[in-house]
């Protein structure tokens, strides 16, 4: 029997009303993502990469089409219902880390757990374990302004995985990093994928980064083309 997809969209369409005309960003996209996959999403600026991630992550609703995540029909859920799923089963990493400046690294990473109602000591213990996993055990009491760009992005990754999500959606996670830090972040994501089974969908302009993923999803003119990367490394 075929594996049930972790995430699936069927005939997904998204357009925006602008004055007297419509801007169609995504047009009848059908896509299935299996557990443990690491997929890069590439395309020109404005092609719809971020829009696709927002829809698949339940941050926005499609104009038409269906989205299923772990058996949940996201397109049918209320905003509050989608919010609960996002906090418990999804992780997000962005180009800009959006760390809370008044909180230290440990508190920033623990925040999703605290929002989810986890006890303070349990949340901090889990956050500390995750920070050790991403190589930041010596920075748990540091504040965001004391971190380098690469360290800040590692904190963002730690915050994204602290709830042990089955899927992480990353939007240009290395966009503000130099090549050395970009390579370091990729190796971190690959480790999480290989050893912990985390599934990744990563929007990127970096074709070298994309070529290191299992599959590459190209968006152009609102359509997608998915290719297998046989040289995954």
From Swiss-Prot:
The record's subcellular location field reads: Cell inner membrane
The way it spans or sits in the membrane comes to: Peripheral membrane protein
**In its UniProt record, which GO terms are filed under biological process?**
lipoprotein localization to membrane
| EC category | translocase
The residues listed in the UniProt record as binding ATP, with positions renumbered to this chain, are 43-50
Q: Name one GO molecular function term.
A: ATP binding
Q: Indicate yes or no for the key word S-adenosyl-L-methionine.
A: no
Which GO cellular component terms, listed alphabetically, does the Swiss-Prot or TrEMBL entry include?
Answer: plasma membrane
What are the residue boundaries of the ABC transporter domain, all occurrences included?
7-233
Q: What are its E.C. numbers?
A: 7.6.2.-
Determine the domain of life of the protein's source.
Bacteria
User: How does this polypeptide assemble, per the annotation?
Assistant: The complex is composed of two ATP-binding proteins (LolD) and two transmembrane proteins (LolC and LolE).
Q: Which protein are we looking at?
A: Lipoprotein-releasing system ATP-binding protein LolD
Q: Which organism is it from?
A: Blochmanniella pennsylvanica (strain BPEN)
